[in-house]
Amino acid sequence: MLHAVTDSSASGPADGQAGAPKFRRVLLKVSGEALMGSQNYGIDIDTADRIAREVAAAVKGGTEMCLVIGGGNIFRGLSGAAKGMDRAAADYMGMLATVMNALAMQTALERIGVQTRVQSAIPMTTVCEPYIRRRATRHMEKGRVVIFAAGTGNPFFTTDTAAALRAAEMGCDALLKGTQVDGVYSDDPRTNPDAERFDQLDYLDVLTRDLRVMDASAVTLMRENAIPIVVFDIHKTNGLARVLAGEGKCTMIGKMKSDAAAV
């Protein structure tokens, strides 16, 4: 049974603290845009360092962590294709952007003493390991953070789908999606103040209402493997720790109702 994450503003530990982790192993999906901070392009080192500290605290608390980072802060394949580029070539460029972000996050984590491995779906052994599932699992069992780069290694698949695939392969208890807002809304709350916010959603509700928190293939893969998706604000201080402890403001997506009721 899936339990909702509750808002810690009502009860729980004091500010700046969080309870014991509720998940043994999780995949954290971070958008490339999240790494920009207040910049319009590229990687903001202060933002990468802050996210690294959150991940380090989670590992220290006993949670096994793996990450998938998008590449939209550097290059987005769909945008390139929309401007006339060959879609496959544009997607490969986007995959290379995720490798750059993964290396930046690895550097941020290792700078604070967290052993980290980058595994790429596109082999580039000079800079990182190739993706090998059993090796990635062993890394996490030894307390290392694993960052999966280059998406699925195939064009026409998003990094959301790559995150869902890796979460299923790694046997993760949840996929945590760190975004720019504190959950799933009916519309972009930054442009529509009347957008409805959801605390809980069924997988099928996300698909039938076209809420676009993740692409349909990613949500379907999570549904088929019964892995909950937790959407939270990656920029909120201690946001990751609170979500891992079953607290904090977020949206939980999972098996909330029967398939017949969800349609």
From Swiss-Prot:
Gene Ontology biological process terms in this record: 'de novo' CTP biosynthetic process; UDP biosynthetic process
List of residues binding ATP: 29-32, 72, 76, 179-180, 185, 188
EC number(s) stated in the UniProt entry for this protein: 2.7.4.22
Enzymatic class: transferase
Pathway: Pyrimidine metabolism; CTP biosynthesis via de novo pathway; UDP from UMP (UMPK route): step 1/1
Complexes and interactors: Homohexamer.
UniProt protein name: Uridylate kinase
Organism: Maricaulis maris (strain MCS10) (Caulobacter maris)
